[in-house]
């Protein structure tokens, strides 16, 4: 039945209550303790729609029968609060949220839609990791940081709009988002972690922000269908493994701000047939083009440049830039 006067649910209060299928309406609840409903695997109906509660860590972890949640008035969600809720399909709203714990919805593999997210400045680490069906999520324009692996292996995510309030995208944030078609990083972003878009194999075009001065390691590795990459304006080096496994990339022009091409930067770019290397480049790692088809690859170089000398020494076909 309903629980009209209940205000507080203790830590582990219903933990492993394997026969619990319904928790009645509790409109006055303000706090749900840590592990309160952990592994209530038959719990389908939760009478907390619209309540202004704080939800503790792992409060609903592995509640594998929940399908929809309205968290529109919830202000705080703890770490792993809803992780491993494998049948959860919809989170109607997170519009009042001011504190969201890391891994909060990790491995909610049926989760398709997340409603409006409140005015967070940071999206926590691994918050939607392995949400393999996630297709609809909108980030607020207060967002400044997208945390480590926040969307890692969200295989179904077809697009993401990164607000121009974001300045930092941490490592692996979108790694393995295999349905993303185009990736445009706003110019507000000045810091990006390694492998940030690695394995986004369906993306055909990737645009990095103008003011980034470096390329993160393995940044777009295994973006199998990428045919166009737009460099930052002041980038100084092509980092380790950055284009590794970009097997559809045919031509690329390296900006004249670049001085270094690092370890295996273009490893296994097997379709690469033409690369323009400016006179600004003064160092190319001996492994930078490992796995490329040397007999089909033409370097476009400046007469007397380091790139020309390197091409001659290593038996690459080269022509002079016009």
Name each region found by the language model.
Residues 10-15, 33-38, 56-59, 78-81, ...:
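Consensus positions within tandem repeat domains that build extended binding/scaffold surfaces
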């Amino acid at each position: 039945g309903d629980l009209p006067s209940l205000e507080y649910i203790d830590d582990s209060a219903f933990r492993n209550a394997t026969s619990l299928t319904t928790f009645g309406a509790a409109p006055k609840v303000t706090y749900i303790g840590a592990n309160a409903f952990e592994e209530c695997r038959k719990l389908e109906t939760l009478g907390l729609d619209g309540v202004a509660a704080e939800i503790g860590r792992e409060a609903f972890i592995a509640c594998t029968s929940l399908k929809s949640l309205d968290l529109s008035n919830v202000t705080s969600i703890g770490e792993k609060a809803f992780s491993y809720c494998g049948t959860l399909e919809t989170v109607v709203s997170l519009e009042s949220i001011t504190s969201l714990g890391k891994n909060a919805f990790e491995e909610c593999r049926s989760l398709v839609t997340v409603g409006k997210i409140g005015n967070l400045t940071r999206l926590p680490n691994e918050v939607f990791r392995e949400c393999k069906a996630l297709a609809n999520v909108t980030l607020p324009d207060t967002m400044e940081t997208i945390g480590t692996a926040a969307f890692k292996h969200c295989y179904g995510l077809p697009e993401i709009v990164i607000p121009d309030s974001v300045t930092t995208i941490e490592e692996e944030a979108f790694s393995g988002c295999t349905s993303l078609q185009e990736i445009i990083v706003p110019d507000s972003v000045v810091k990006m972690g390694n492998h940030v878009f690695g394995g986004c194999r369906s993306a055909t075009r990737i645009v990095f922000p103008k003011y980034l001065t470096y390329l993160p390691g393995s940044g777009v590795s295994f973006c199998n269908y990428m045919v166009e990459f737009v460099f930052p304006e002041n980038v100084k080096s092509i980092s380790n493994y950055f284009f590794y496994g970009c097997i559809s990339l045919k031509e690329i022009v390296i900006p004249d701000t670049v001085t270094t091409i690092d370890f295996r930067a273009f490893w296994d770019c097997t379709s690469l047939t033409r690369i323009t290397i400016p006179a600004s480049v003064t160092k190319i790692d001996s492994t930078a083009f490992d796995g490329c088809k040397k007999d089909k690859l033409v370097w476009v170089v400046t007469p007397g440049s380091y790139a020309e000398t390197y091409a001659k020494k290593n038996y690459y076909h080269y022509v002079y830039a016009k």
